[in-house]
UniProtKB/Swiss-Prot annotation:
The C-terminal region contains a putative helix-turn-helix (HTH) motif, suggesting that this region may bind DNA. InterPro entries: Flagellar_FlhD, FlhD_sf. It is found in: Cytoplasm. Belongs to the FlhD family. Homodimer; disulfide-linked. Forms a heterohexamer composed of two FlhC and four FlhD subunits. Each FlhC binds a FlhD dimer, forming a heterotrimer, and a hexamer assembles by dimerization of two heterotrimers. It comes from Cupriavidus pinatubonensis (strain JMP 134 / LMG 1197) (Cupriavidus necator (strain JMP 134)). This is Flagellar transcriptional regulator FlhD.
Length: 105
C-alpha cells in the first residue's frame, strides 16, 4: 500500500470517527463521554464543531481516535469466548470506566 493511500485512509477514519463522536455527544453527552473516554471539555468542543471544522480536523495525517484497549485484562476479556456474554460486556464496561478520560492537557 502506498503512503498516499494510507494517508487517505487515515483521513477517512478520522472523518468517520469525528462524525460519530459528534453525533453521540449531541444525542447524549454523558453516555458519549463514557463511550468515547473524553472529558466534558472535549465533548463540548466536539458538539460545537462545524462541518468545515470537522473536515479540517479529519485531514490530519495522524489518527485522531485512540485505541483504548491498552490494558491486557480488558483486551483478554473482550477477545476470549465467555459462556455469559452479558457478564463479559459488563466486566469490560467496568474496566473501561476505571480508565481516566482524555482531556486537553
Amino acid at each position: 500500500m502506498e503512503s498516499s493511500e494510507v494517508l487517505q485512509e487515515i483521513r477517512e477514519v478520522n472523518l468517520a470517527y469525528l462524525l460519530l463522536a459528534q453525533r453521540l455527544v449531541r444525542e447524549n453527552q454523558v453516555e458519549a463521554m463514557f463511550r468515547l473516554g473524553v472529558s466534558k471539555e472535549i465533548a463540548d468542543i466536539l458538539a460545537k464543531l462545524t462541518s468545515a471544522q470537522l473536515v479540517k480536523l479529519a485531514a490530519s495525517n495522524m489518527v485522531l481516535c485512540r485505541f483504548r484497549f491498552d490494558d491486557h485484562a480488558l483486551l483478554s476479556t473482550l477477545t476470549h469466548t465467555a459462556k455469559n456474554h452479558d457478564m463479559q460486556q459488563m466486566h469490560a464496561a467496568i474496566l473501561l470506566a476505571r480508565q481516566p478520560v482524555e482531556s486537553l492537557n
